[in-house]
Amino acid sequence: LMAGMAHLPEDRRREIGRDALTVCRQVAEDEACGRTPRRMCPLNTAGRCGLHSHRLMICRLHGVPHELRFPDGTVSRGQGCPVFTGRFPDRDYIPFDRTPFYRKLSALEQEFRKAAGLDRKFKMTIAQMIAHDPDIQP
């Protein structure tokens, strides 16, 4: 993500930084009022990612049908976004079990955290990652 940001012109980085700070403020306000935050990613420009070639895995999978199997046996399924489902009108559901990929990703994260001596989890949105980056000055 940050490697992609580094390739952008400075004025665009500043604009994204301002947008990220705005999104973070809006999310905090939503949460303070008991609302579920639903805010657009600060990298979004006219429905497209401004860092398309550097986007995160979760972004690459957005809109694709999914299936997740939880340890308690429950299964969560999503059919995907209308653009995806519109390409396959004759199919009610296209199975894509992400569980093995997320397990591998979790194992990689644990391995990295152990090697780096990190003892806490980091759960940040893209807006938060950008807003907390000292190299991004709005």
Protein language model features and the residues they cover:
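Short loop/turn segments that flank or connect secondary-structure elements
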Residues: M2-P138
